[in-house]
């Protein structure tokens, strides 16, 4: 009986440690992904009047690229 209880407690402890490791790993990668995300770059859009080159540029216009100028 004591062996069964010990086995269950040990299994729960191992499970808790694995959850902690996975959570820390996921949090670390989510911060890295957030820094590299194109969505972050979209929010930094070019202001109106700046030259633009259509869909191939790294940082898009805040509005629309029209006649090679952001509007």
Curated annotation (Swiss-Prot):
SUPFAM superfamilies: omega toxin-like. Reversibly blocks N-type calcium channels (Cav2.2/CACNA1B) in rat dorsal root ganglion cells. Elicits no toxic symptoms in either vertebrates or invertebrates during a period of 48 hours post-injection, when it was assayed in vivo by direct injection into mice and cockroaches. One of its GO terms (cellular component) is extracellular region. The keyword Zinc does not apply. Expressed by the venom gland. Keywords: Calcium channel impairing toxin, Disulfide bond, Ion channel impairing toxin, Knottin, Neurotoxin, Secreted, Signal, Toxin, Voltage-gated calcium channel impairing toxin. This is Hainantoxin-X-2. The keyword Signal applies. Residues 27-43 form a propeptide. It is found in: Secreted. Residues 1-26 form the signal peptide. The presence of a 'disulfide through disulfide knot' structurally defines this protein as a knottin. Belongs to the neurotoxin 36 family. 02 subfamily. GO terms for molecular function: calcium channel regulator activity; toxin activity. Disulfide bonds join 52-65, 61-70. Its main location: secreted.
């Amino acid at each position: 009986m004591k062996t069964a209880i010990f086995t269950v407690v040990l299994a729960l402890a191992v499970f808790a440690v694995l959850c902690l490791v996975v959570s820390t790993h996921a949090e670390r990668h989510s911060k890295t992904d957030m820094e590299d995300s194109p969505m972050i770059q979209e929010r930094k859009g070019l202001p109106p009047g700046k030259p633009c080159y259509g869909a191939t540029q790294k940082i898009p216009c805040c509005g629309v690229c029209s006649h090679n100028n952001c509007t």
